[in-house]
Amino acid sequence: MKKGLIVLVAVIFLLAGCGANGASGDHKQLKEIRIGIQQSLSPLLIAKEKGWFEDAFEKEGIKVKWVEFQSGPPQFEGLAADKLDFSQVGNSPVIAGQAAGIDFKEIGLSQDGLKANGILVNQNSGIQDVKGLKGKKIAVAKGSSGFDFLYKALDQVGLSANDVTIIQLQPDEAASAFENGSVDAWSIWEPYLSLETMKHGAKILVNGESTDLYSPGFTLVRTKFSEEHPDEVVRFLKVFNKAVVWQKEHLDEAADLYSDIKDLDKKVVENVLKNTEPLNEIISDDIVKAQQETADFQFRTKAIDKKIDVKDVVDNTFIKKALEEHSSGGDQ
């Protein structure tokens, strides 16, 4: 009888365990998703404004919380502290986050970044090329895609960070410093590139296109979240895809919407959209190769303290499923 009781207890625990595991993956057990969003003009902002994420998730009993950031690196603090589930960031924060051991996955390519990053100088600065930055003060957000772009652009002409004075500033602070002449140059991304050139007379010294330097952007998810709620990761990507498609099909309306939300001149917005085509795609081998080259460069220049294999954080499973479901006729 004692043996039978032991077997019965074991079976009960086994069944309880199965039930618990099933519940952990059930979206009905999920109460809230936290989405990080930057100041960029991204379809993520369109979806936020139109309430598409709320429509898709709240009908399943899941609340949507938006968390605003100025750049990518602080978002990794949120991921590491379990205060963020999804985010979209540039290439450099992804590499720094992986090198720091933060647990996340890249689940989609959100832009190629060819024209999205550049180095600004004032029109009358006298600086004609990247070599002219030697000895100058340059504003940049540490660990951002602009940070990586600056280091690579300097390296291309035989300079390093030791040849310039790096002033680490987040975009809002950097804009003031650049406009009042406290710094000589600013390594930054859109929409700031268009805003400064069109409204304040700045000029783009170089960008990704002129230097052939890619700065791709990625959609990220916290690894534990993706393991426990895979269906919700697919749902997120499908909603984002809806916003990407809508922007491409309603470009003028999208420009009006961004202009209203950000209080920007529509012509500035149109220029930003011309330079930053949104994507929601599988992370290709070419992008992985470019990321690995960036990671190796950052290790060589001591921006990160260990070598990493960037493939370790790539997971195309969710985007493949999301795109398949979208093509079969279901946006959400």
Swiss-Prot record:
- Show the CDD domains listed in the entry: PBP2_NrtA_SsuA_CpmA_like
- Signals that turn on the gene: Repressed by sulfate and cysteine.
Covalent lipid attachment of type N-palmitoyl cysteine occurs at C18
Instruction: Supply one GO CC term from the record.
Output: plasma membrane
User: Which compartments does it reside in?
Assistant: Cell membrane
Gene Ontology MF terms in the entry: ATPase-coupled transmembrane transporter activity
User: Do you know which Pfam families this protein is assigned to?
Assistant: NMT1
Q: Which family does it belong to?
A: Belongs to the bacterial solute-binding protein SsuA/TauA family.
Q: Its function?
A: Part of a binding-protein-dependent transport system for aliphatic sulfonates. Putative binding protein.
Q: What is this protein called?
A: Putative aliphatic sulfonates-binding protein
- Name the source organism: Bacillus subtilis (strain 168)
Organism classification: Bacteria, Bacillati, Bacillota, Bacilli, Bacillales
Q: Which gene encodes it?
A: ssuA
